[in-house]
UniProtKB/Swiss-Prot annotation:
GO cellular component: a single term: cytoplasm
Pfam family, one: DUF167
NCBIfam families: DUF167 family protein
Lineage per the UniProt record: Archaea, Methanobacteriati, Methanobacteriota, Thermococci, Thermococcales
HAMAP family: UPF0235
Protein name in UniProt: UPF0235 protein PYRAB05010
Family: Belongs to the UPF0235 family.
Residue ranges crossing the lipid bilayer per the database entry: none
Length: 92
């Protein structure tokens, strides 16, 4: 669910669009992914843009979707942070 790489940390997330608020819901143990609630609808990339904005604000870093542009399951790179910082911000 979290993997430290040279560029930063890769998060494996599952996005739940149309939520009441943007938030980290918890961990989906079965899928091995972090559950992220996003207010935006999954239409024309709105949920992806909102996910990037939410995670960028949470970590204070640049965020990029590496895999899963059209799926709810995504691999996201948070640049310039380490694993401990990500765990602390996610409260894991």
């Amino acid at each position: 669910m979290l993997k430290e790489v040279r560029e930063g940390v890769i998060l494996r997330v599952i996005v739940k669009p149309n939520a009441r608020e943007n938030s980290i819901e918890g961990i989906d143990e079965w899928r091995g992914r972090i559950k992220v609630n996003i207010k935006a609808q999954p239409v024309k990339g709105k949920a992806n843009r909102e996910l990037i904005k939410f995670l960028s604000n949470l970590f204070g870093a640049e965020v990029e979707i590496l895999k899963g542009e059209t799926s709810r399951e995504k691999d996201v790179l948070v640049r310039g942070v380490n694993l401990e910082e990500v765990k602390r911000r996610l409260k894991l």
